[in-house]
């Protein structure tokens, strides 16, 4: 009888900030599979301007995970989010508990 190890893939959201812009991104097995970019608008706001998920990863919840991480980041820093990205805006529209950071 053959035994197979079950492979567990983790989709942890990471944050990268460079000067006045940044990105939340997800790596799977060392490869970036999704990214959501933002820019700082002054000291108290960030503008989410783009969300992208690599082909084959659509529908896995990566986009919502990144928006959720952005909301946590905004709450920790006491800042607001302006979701210009249509995907991010749709998540905010569907998730009333995120609206405190708008």
Stretches found by the model and what they are:
Residues 22-33:
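Conserved beta-hairpin
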Residues 45-54:
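Conserved acetyl-CoA binding element of GNAT-fold acetyltransferases
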Residues 36-44:
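A conserved beta-strand-loop-helix scaffold within acyl/acetyltransferase catalytic domains
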Residues 57, 61-66:
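Conserved acetyl-CoA pyrophosphate-binding loop and the N-cap/start of the following alpha-helix
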Residues 1-9:
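Short, Lys/Arg-enriched N-terminal segments with co-localized hydrophobic residues
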Residues 15-17:
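Short loop/turn motifs at secondary-structure junctions and domain boundaries
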Residues 69-102:
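C-terminal structural segments of small proteins and small subunits
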